[in-house]
Amino acid sequence: MPSHTPNGIAHFDVLGPEPDALHEFYSAVFNWKVDPQGPGYALVQTPAGSPDGAVVEAEQAGIVVGIVVQDLDATVAAAEAHGGQVVMPPTDNGWVVKAQVTDPAGNLLSLIGG
């Protein structure tokens, strides 16, 4: 992750049911390096200084934005207090501690403890 700046965008996931088509699209259109890691998951490397991401196989298409936060629990509570919903409580996945919330419109955000 290139950014550990509090409240800065650090990561993104591009979701869709046909990951191979997404790999081809982002490689060809933006010249991003796509590195498959296994079935349904590939790392995406963007130009220096930009957040890196991943292509993730999922039934529904979408983009998930990863935001670094200083206080994960407080940010999750603030999201709930302002109309968001918790999708995944703070969880250590072995790389980072993160939570997932939706904003009032239903957009999914990954909150990354920093």
Predicted regions located by residue number:
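N-terminal beta-strand motif that seeds the catalytic metal site of vicinal oxygen chelate
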Residues: 1-23, 50-51, 63-67, 112-113
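Vicinal oxygen chelate
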Residues: 1-5, 9-17, 57-82, 84-114
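Conserved catalytic-core motifs of GNAT/GCN5-like acyltransferases
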Residues: 11, 33-39, 89-91
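Conserved active-site tyrosine of GNAT-family acetyltransferases
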Residues: 22-26, 79, 106
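Residues at alpha-helix termini
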Residues: 28-30, 82
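Conserved short beta-strand elements that form part of the metal-binding/catalytic scaffold
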Residues: 30-63, 108-114
